[in-house]
Amino acid sequence: MEQQQQQQLPSTTTRPKPKLLNRLNTYVGSSRVGKRFKLAERNSTFTTELRAGTATFLTMAYILAVNASILSDSGGTCSVSDCIPLCSNPAIEPSQCTGPGLRLIQPDVSCKFNPVNPGYAACVEEIRKDLIVATVAASLIGCVIMGLMANLPLALAPGMGTNAYFAYTVVGFHGSGSISYRTALAAVFIEGLIFLFISAIGFRAKLAKLVPKPVRISSSAGIGLFLAFIGLQNNQGIGLVGYSPSTLVTLAACPASSRISLAPVITSANGTVSLLAGGSVSGDIMCIHGRMESPTFWLGIVGFVIIAYCLVKNVKGAMIYGIVFVTAVSWFRNTEVTAFPNTSAGDAAHDYFKKIVDVHVIKHTAGALSFSGINKGHFWEALVTFLYVDILDTTGTLYSMARFAGFVDEKGDFAGQYFAFMSDASAIVIGSLLGTSPVTVFIESSTGIREGGRTGLTAITVAVYFLLAMFFTPLLASIPAWAVGPPLILVGVMMMKSVTEIDWEDMREAIPAFVTMILMPLTYSVAYGLIGGIGSYVVLHLWDWGEEGLVKLGFLKRKVKEEDNNNGVVKASEIDTTV
């Protein structure tokens, strides 16, 4: 017996120790933190949640620069009072504007438009910096609330689409819209409170359940197509898809030197060409040569292949590897794929990038709400629009992300949905107080879910990155679009799996599902896809509902003759129309 024990001792002492990460996962999983976030129950680990949060943040980090850029186009709180007097001779500085024939010209409302007054331009730049920090702060707080209260791997930030509506339709370019920036924030604030109220009483969840099953299922695939479409474009993707005047979209991938912008213009009788009233100049979206010679496109393709190959081989962190590789290559200057071209804008971006650490304090947008325009019709028009878009858009996104993560049960519910709705609504209120447009659950959360994120620790990890972004915004704001495009496309691929749950043999389900999916990318709106899907579902079922109502009222008698072998429903021919 002693010899056997002695023989067994070497085997126990030479047994390899668990790896450091495994020991860390075991320790955290059994700790109060692990139990609080249900790591073991949801078959996840601490390091998996960290990796998922990292992937989610990297795919949505573009919002830091993009949201601030869009909202600052409204002019924010800047006004004519920020414009400075200019000399009648533009070549002379105002301080030296003395002498015969020279005078200081006091600014008027035209100082906000081209050529923009230097004082107003400086104010807008301060607003942009304020909005970067406001975006970070609102996103950070929203992610913390979602992670702690709902325990879901969902990240929040100011939503794309609603920010454009806020800036260009409600407030208008440099304040040329129907209501002021301050009043628009008040509309978002009140809308957030209404949203919070209907979420608190559980009415929002009931509204969500009213969405027909085929629309709920297909919305996940529709959002996937939407993401892929974004990833294929030039502004936020690899640039494979561009504008065509004859077919709307076409194959692009041309270099920046071969792209042009478009603008709605009007030609007068004397041949003068001017911008159409209310029109705006687009980005460089149209290729003038049909050759795929864009270096950034091919670098994006390399990133796509890296991520795709890692996914095929089930390599963890696939999204991160692709983003980091493309971004690192793009940070080298004086190359064909640089994120910092030798232009004034490129020089400014590179100078900002070289700061690495930059802390900015919000000076203008925080608490800038004004309720003075609450009695105007445009105010309530904006409020109602924000509300219905948030109800349809964010609710659809929440359910799609929950379904993608496998949380939704047979009844259409998922764990933590009450607090998820509350977190989302709370973030809208907080965002308005900081000065930004409505905050919502980001569809890029699907990237982290794909990396294995299943608990609120993923959202908390994203919040930590947003906290770091307070100090490292120059680095994170320098992630190029062609680095973000590949993961968006591949997440779209993975989100298409929900279409297998649709009964394509039943046209009453197939048509609404298809309408939902196709409208989301082609109208650039999740909300419009849901509206189209629900509308087509109602139209296709209206006749059956009418007959059912007449049967219940006794005007028609039902005679069951045969049963549909496919779905077991009573056919229209089975109803006796005899009164």
UniProtKB/Swiss-Prot annotation:
Biological process terms in GO annotation: adenine transport; guanine transport; purine nucleobase transport
Swiss-Prot/TrEMBL keywords: Membrane, Transmembrane, Transmembrane helix, Transport
Residues in coiled coil: none
Transmembrane stretches, start-end: 52-72, 131-151, 183-203, 221-241, 260-280, 292-312, 320-340, 379-399, 414-434, 459-479, 480-500, 514-534
One of the record's GO molecular function terms: purine nucleobase transmembrane transporter activity
GO terms under cellular component: cytosol; membrane
Transmembrane helix recorded as keyword: yes
Principal location class: membrane
Intrachain S-S bonds: none
Inactivation phenotype: Resistance to 8-azaadenine and 8-azaguanine but not to other toxic nucleobase analogs. Deficiency in the uptake of adenine and guanine.
UniProt subcellular location: Membrane
Pfam families: Xan_ur_permease
Membrane topology: Multi-pass membrane protein
Primary role: Transports natural purines (adenine and guanine) as well as purine analogs. Confers sensitivity to 8-azaadenine and 8-azaguanine (8-azg).
Similarity annotation: Belongs to the nucleobase:cation symporter-2 (NCS2) (TC 2.A.40) family. Azg-like subfamily.
Name of the featured protein: Adenine/guanine permease AZG1
Organism field: Arabidopsis thaliana
Organism lineage: Eukaryota, Viridiplantae, Streptophyta, Embryophyta, Tracheophyta
Name of the encoding gene: AZG1
